[in-house]
Every structure is written in C-alpha cells, then in structure tokens.
Amino acid sequence: MSVRLLDDIINIKGDGTGVAGLRSSFKFIMITVLGVALGWFFAVKLGFDTVHLPFIGDIALGWLMIPVFAFSVVATGNAVNISDGLDGLAGGLLMASFGAFGIIALLQGQFMLAGFCFTVIGAILAYLWFNIYPARFFMGDVGSFALGTSLGVVAMMTNAFFLLPIIGILFVVEAGSSAIQIFSKKVFKRKVFISAPIHHHLEAQGWPETKVTMRFWVIATVAAFVGVLVALAGGHILL
C-alpha cells in the first residue's frame, strides 16, 4: 500500500523530471517482495500449507504455499488496479467479490474475517456514493491495490484460492485482456483489442461508460453467487 501511495503522490505533485510516478519494474519488485513476505508469514508462522481444490479435497503444498500466496496477492492487486478504469467499476466488482468471500467466511465460522469483508463492503458503498458516474472521487492506485491485495489474502484465509478466478472472473478478464494486448503488440506488432483492458474496448465499440459498468456489476454478482454455490458443493464449507 505504501508503494502505491508514494506512486500516487508523485503522480499528483510531479518530481520535476517529467517522469510520472514510480517505474513499473520497481513497483512490481516491491509488491512481489511484500507478497513473498506475507506468504512466508502465512505458511511458516500461521501454519497454512494446504489449498482446497473444489470437489477434490485439500492439496498439501508445503513451502510452495509461499509463492502461491504471493501470486494470489500480487495478481489480484494488479488485476483490481487494471479494472479501476471507469466510474464505479472497480468498486462494484469488489463489493460482489468481498460479499461472496464474506458469506463463505461466515459459513466457515470465521466471524472476524466475515466481519472484515462486510466492513469493506460498507466502506465501498460510501465510496461509491461519490464514485458512480459522474465521479467526484477516485480510489487511485493506493485504494485499488490495497483492496485487491486484501481480496487475495481473504481468498487464502478462506482456503478458497481456486474460487478466486470464479468469484473475481471479471478481474481475470480485465487483466487477461491487457496481457493479451501487450503480448500481441510486442510479438505480432498488432492489437487484438481496439483498446485494453476490455472495458475500454467496449467503450471504443460504442458502449456508454455507464452501460459497461452496470453490465459488469451484473456479471460480477452472478459470478459471486456461483462462487458461493461451488464453495458449498465443493467442500469448502462443512454444514
């Protein structure tokens, strides 16, 4: 979070060199180091060394839990950051995802974790009052990455790492479309999308900003509902 806060401050005030913000490589390294440190604490100090695969069971990872945890945190943080491109978009998607994991945590008996998820939802609701179109306030890198990394941590604490791509399917699509666009431009020297990530592609095709946002909210809500159903049927929750 501190890395993104510094980046936002530099972006706003400028440093006199004409370079906006911190270098992407520096931010990625620092965030990865943070993810590995959190993964080590999660695996070594808290003793978490398994992940649950829906309908299969627990998979023992041992020390591999550290890179898996780091990937969950770093990938989710960056995916949410990429999704924060339209008024109200990231906030709505995050509400759906935190809602799903909050329900899963509640049914698992992790009441403090569930309380955290629902508190985040309350905070996002207050934020969305001012962020829906036309937005007056924006979360910036510090907000999107803090919430994204928190979502990744919650997924690990509910032992639902493999549910994260289902519940957060639109984060996967957003980040994936950007990755595909970058790869295609560098390797094939052409673009797959008119603009990336996908929400800008839809805008370029003539969709109004509010239409993209509301339809993504609908998809995110359905994905969250499906994720909870998979958690119930797949063995994440023992009733």
Ranges and model annotations:
Residues L170-I180:
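Transmembrane helix segments
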Residues L6-A20, A179-T210:
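Cytosolic, membrane-interface loops and tails of multi-pass inner-membrane proteins
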Residues L164, F183-V187, G235-L239:
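Short beta-alpha connecting loops at secondary-structure transitions
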Residues L46-F48, V226-L239:
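Juxtamembrane boundary at the C-terminal end of a transmembrane helix
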Residues K211-A231:
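Final/C-terminal transmembrane alpha-helix of multipass membrane proteins
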Residues F138-V142, V154, H200-M214:
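C-terminal domain-closing interface element
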Residues M1-F138, V142-V172:
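"…together with the soluble PPM/PP2C metallo-phosphatase catalytic core" -> "…together
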